[in-house]
Amino acid sequence: MLKNKLGINNPIELAKEEERITKTKAIELFKTKKLETFEVGTFKGLSQIHKYLFEDVYEFAGKIREENISKNNFRFASAMYLKEALNKIDKMPQSNFDEIIEKYIEMNIAHSFREGNGRSTRIWLDMILKNEINKVVDWSKISKEDYLLAMERSPVKNIEIKFLIKNALTDKIDDRQVYMKGIDASYNYEGYNLYNAEDLENKN
């Protein structure tokens, strides 16, 4: 279980509080327009997102991981070479849809942080799409099963994730409802679905 700032030793309780706290922070990113002050398409920008979301829960928020990690028998970039990999990703082009998704896939393979990579990187991807092609993803249109399978295959076959994302693009780039539904969908991909973004916003 991950060491946390909340002093929680129960993994179920930690997951619950992590979702509540970080989803609330994700809402704040949109409402306060803080997101618009972050770098677009760089690891620095991704780190800024991750730090903002997770700084109340984990000491490692925004910091490059020092451990090797894997998921479903897939080993992400070695911690030893992670900084070098991130430098290469920073230099990847992002001027059109294909380039942007290819960059996103590489950032996912890097998996820069100990926890919270997917949720942070999907926000990062939307920032690039918005900045470069005036679109964002309506994540609520992509099912959890389709997304996870396509991302699992993406290092060797990116056509599936490109197809899913292209079909979910919208020009409602500043739409509150698209963002809120997207946050809920993004968290659901990772198994966090106890809280609804709309309800959390209304409580604050």
Predicted features and spans:
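FIC/Doc superfamily catalytic core
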Residues: 1-204
